[in-house]
Amino acid sequence: MQPISPGAAVLVVGAGITGRAVLAALAPLGARATLTDDSPTALTASAQQRVEVLDPATAVDRIADFDLVVVSPGIPPTAPIPVAAAAAGIPVWGDVELAWHLDRSGRFGPPRQWLVVTGTNGKTTTTSMLYAMLQAGGRRAVLCGNIGDPVLSQLDRPADVLAVELSSFQLHWAPSLRPEAGAVLNVAEDHLDWHGSMAAYAGDKARALTGRVAVGGLDDAIAAGLLADAPAPVKVGFRLGDPGPGEFGVRDGVLIDNAFGRDLALADADTIPVAGPVGVLDALAAAALARAVDVPAAAIAEALATFHVGRHRAEVVAVADGITYVDDSKATNPHAAQASVSAFPRVVWVAGGLLKGASVDEMVEATKDRLVGVVLIGRDRAIVGNALSRHAPDVPVVELVTGEDSVVLEKDESGVTRVTRVIQTGDRTLADAVMTAAVDAARGLATSGDTVLLAPAGASFDQFTGYGHRGDAFAAAVRAAIR
């Protein structure tokens, strides 16, 4: 029996947004879907909606009853259900793999052109730029994937092209995906706890490069290596410098297509509304994907000139007393934080959170000459502090400790000029207390001409509900402080 033929038994793992999209997609196919989730509350709510449910332990025991397992992207391959399915020879798909099969089947009309964006950092901005370029070029396009709506939920919309942001998790569970064009922007340490190794992480990213056109960042050693090894018949690199044959790049301040055109000018780099080199790289990658499906240069220029940066992505919150306050809470790993700090000449860096096993030494070494002060927050702040002591011992540091997380305070290495402040939350939430103290400390370190930059280099879930919550708390604290 084919995995998604009528009557097929499908186990759906995860009752969140993705799981609900999978259930909705399976219903008209005649498949028999069963939902499992670690949350008994979620299973009870689903059962009340007449969804067949199983607890995870029972699902493992009965894994042989299923023809297909569809997992939410956060489920690692080492989880009990994927392990049991693999041992039983049962295919395990993600929602993107299911969407790919359904789109290729013609169930929703002629198959779309998939343009896929992945990378450790810059995915959302690049995919958004790509979508704007497609729209400016008159294409019927849909923006989907990790950026918001699951691909599955968008297949019934009239479209010729899908601009799809995909994470390494989603790519891991999409082995058959062959996009019209796909880009790997960059690859740096992230999610190693999920993938198990850097090689496995990079290998999953490389699945974006298995279609007709592969696009890769040449200024990133790992991305460039993945591009060189890609099976795609057309390979296109992009770089900040002068582009060679088959490349996109920058010449005399102008974005140039030397791959699908011959030294074709696309747009002035100074029209890109994302600060620093990272904005130029994102625009080059988006332009390469757009040009792969024949979007004209004029449409690319129009899209970049009118593009708006998303929330919490190098977003200027305020300027007061000559100090610029920037929310880049989306910089949730050291690679992203390095790019963020590198966009400004003098930075008071607000950093910390959950590093997920990543090292910050390379990032601190690369940006130390830009740092005029550092404010450390969050669970792994001592790791950042120790990196500062090794590579930037003259930079003043204020470390913020709360009663809630002081248990994880580690012994600091000597060398850093460090002040430790214990936060008292009082009647405030932890998030408000942390950011109020962080902004107060940062203002004390900054002078006119400096940038106070929230670019944490870590995930937010130790003290906030997400990077958006963290950024909102920062912005609120800034506005309160400068009144």
UniProtKB/Swiss-Prot annotation:
GO terms classed as biological process: cell division; cell wall organization; peptidoglycan biosynthetic process; regulation of cell shape
Known EC number: 6.3.2.9
Positions bound to ATP: 119-125
Chief site of localization: cytoplasm
Group of enzyme by EC: ligase
Molecular function per GO: ATP binding; UDP-N-acetylmuramoylalanine-D-glutamate ligase activity
Keywords, sorted A to Z: ATP-binding, Cell cycle, Cell division, Cell shape, Cell wall biogenesis/degradation, Cytoplasm, Ligase, Nucleotide-binding, Peptidoglycan synthesis
Record bears the keyword Cell wall biogenesis/degradation: yes
Pathway stated in the Swiss-Prot or TrEMBL entry: Cell wall biogenesis; peptidoglycan biosynthesis
Subcellular location: Cytoplasm
Catalytic reaction(s) noted: UDP-N-acetyl-alpha-D-muramoyl-L-alanine + D-glutamate + ATP = UDP-N-acetyl-alpha-D-muramoyl-L-alanyl-D-glutamate + ADP + phosphate + H(+)
Entry-linked Pfam families: Mur_ligase_C, Mur_ligase_M, MurD-like_N
SS bond partners: none
Any one GO cellular component localisation term in the record: cytoplasm
Signal peptide: none
Function of the molecule: Cell wall formation. Catalyzes the addition of glutamate to the nucleotide precursor UDP-N-acetylmuramoyl-L-alanine (UMA).
Protein family per UniProt: Belongs to the MurCDEF family.
Protein name as catalogued: UDP-N-acetylmuramoylalanine--D-glutamate ligase
Organism of origin: Mycolicibacterium vanbaalenii (strain DSM 7251 / JCM 13017 / BCRC 16820 / KCTC 9966 / NRRL B-24157 / PYR-1) (Mycobacterium vanbaalenii)
